[in-house]
Structures are given as C-alpha cells and as structure tokens.
Amino acid sequence: MTYAILIIVSLLLISDRISNVVDKYCSENPLDCNEHCLKTKNQIGICHGANGNEKCSCMES
C-alpha cells in the first residue's frame, strides 16, 4: 500500500513538471506551442487560459 501511494505521488509530481514545461510554450511565444505539438504528437497546438497564454494544449486537426 505504501508503495502504491509513493508511485501515485511520484506520477503526480512528474505530470505537474511536464505541464509546467508545456505552459512555458505559450508564455514566451504562442507559436512555440504549435511547434511543440507538431513535433511530439503531430497535432495543432493552441494556447488558452484566462489571458490566452497560460496553457498549451494539443488537438487533432
């Protein structure tokens, strides 16, 4: 049980770091989000959020 909790916490921390890396694509240059999604998932990248530049999401075209 303890191992399961440690694995879940580790995965949550890793996914949080990944999302923070993706978020920087929109804050620096919105075109970076699109390039990131094209290279990693062959999808279109779209920046969104309260200010329009807080989160990068990949979507199928």
UniProtKB/Swiss-Prot annotation:
Q: Which family does it belong to?
A: Belongs to the invertebrate defensin family.
Main subcellular location of this protein, as a coarse class: secreted
* Cysteines paired by S-S bonds: C26-C47, C33-C56, C37-C58
**Proregion residues excised on maturation:** 20-22
| Signal peptide (residue range) | 1-19
**Tissue expression, per UniProt?**
Expressed by the venom gland.
- Taxonomically, which superkingdom? Eukaryota
Entry function: Antibacterial protein.
Q: Which organism is it from?
A: Olivierus martensii (Manchurian scorpion)
Protein name, as recorded: Defensin-like peptide TXKs2
BP GO annotations: defense response to bacterium
Record keywords, A-Z: Antibiotic, Antimicrobial, Defensin, Disulfide bond, Secreted, Signal
Q: Which residues form a coiled coil?
A: none
Query: Looking at the UniProt record for this protein, which Gene Ontology cellular component terms does it annotate, in alphabetical order?
Result: extracellular region
Q: Where in the cell is it found?
A: Secreted
